[in-house]
Regions:
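Scaffold/interface architecture of coatomer-like assemblies
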Residues: 19-310
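N-terminal secretory signal peptides that target proteins for export/translocation
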Residues: 1-2
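Bacterial N-terminal signal peptides
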Residues: 5-16
Length: 310
């Protein structure tokens, strides 16, 4: 009886197939909304949060785009990955850094959107996810208090892995990296870390604690690499010493996150580059305003290749 039913169903399916199948017509439509988190400042570094949609002009690979999404002081929920360097080089400074991180997380989760969440990572020669995304400050703070310094610095691995997790989440993606310098033990390299962050639409805010102001005692190469990572994602690098300057850096990050514009467009007519990377440029009227946003994004084919492991 079952075989008879299957046979009748198969016959019905075959009957629905034309005797001479027509060639398929493939229509490709780009429906991806490209979102940009934008910070605007004046020449004194003051945040400007009063601009309107018509004040912004966007170019994708040199082609002007139509703005389809605009939010001033966006309340899109934040997913914030906090990466703490616990390598041996952090030494006695680590406890001061952790105190400032704790204050930052308390303020972040206590203010703003009640859907904001944080995740906590530590990294030395390996990367450890200490707390997945949560709103429970006590849970994250407890993990912070247990951190100790030892080992090397897998900075790029930490950025790469945290970006992969952020890519799966809704809302705004932010990564705050507390470190004292450059990478020493990662499997991933600088370019892989940057690409992962850009694919995840993640703003990088490296906080490079530099108790030594003389270049001779600092990892200037590591600082330059993180400055480039921040600029490529639309974030900003901070170089505080300990104490009040470190607390001020975290306060500045919070202010920027609360004053961001969210601008989006559906790409049209933008020529593709060989690596599928689209360069973005966004401008606002007036010579005294500076726009901070990510340098670009990867096209769909690049994302598909990455996700399939090719």
């Amino acid at each position: 009886m079952i075989r008879q039913a299957v046979g009748l169903l198969l016959a019905a399916v075959l009957a629905a197939v034309p005797a001479h199948p027509q060639p398929d017509t493939v229509i490709r439509v780009n429906v991806r909304l490209v979102r940009m988190l934008v910070t605007v400042k004046d020449t004194n570094g003051q945040l400007i949060g009063s601009l309107n949609k018509n004040d912004f002009t966007i170019f994708d690979n040199g082609v002007k785009q139509d703005i389809a999404l605009f939010e001033r002081q966006t309340e899109q929920p934040l997913s914030v990955a906090v990466l703490v360097d616990t390598s041996a080089s952090t030494g006695i400074e680590l406890r001061y850094e952790l105190d400032s991180v704790s204050k930052f997380l308390r303020a972040l989760l206590g203010e703003g959107n009640p859907r904001d969440t944080v995740a906590l990572y530590s990294f030395n020669w390996q990367v450890n996810l200490l707390s997945s995304y949560t709103r429970r400050f006590a849970r994250v703070d407890q993990q912070l208090k247990q951190l100790k310094s030892e080992g090397g610095t897998s900075l790029y691995d930490a950025i790469y892995l945290a970006s992969r997790e952020l890519e799966l989440r809704d809302g705004r993606h932010v990564m705050v990296i507390v470190t004292d310098g450059g990478d020493t033990t990662s499997v991933k390299d600088f370019h892989q870390a940057l690409e992962a962050a850009q694919l995840a639409d993640t703003l990088l805010y490296p906080v490079l604690v530099v108790p030594i102001t003389n270049d001779a005692g600092r990892n200037v190469g590591g600082e330059n690499a993180l400055t480039t990572l921040a600029a490529g994602t639309g974030g900003r690098v901070f170089l505080p010493t300990l104490g009040a300057e470190l607390d001020r850096a975290f306060s500045d990050i919070l202010r920027e996150l609360r004053t961001q514009y969210l601008v989006g467009f559906y790409p049209k007519d933008a020529p593709l580059t060989k690596d599928r990377f689209h360069t973005l440029k966004i401008s606002v009227p007036g010579p005294n305003l500076r726009v901070i946003t990510r340098s670009g994004y990867y096209g769909e084919s690049s994302e598909s290749s990455r996700r399939s492991g090719r």
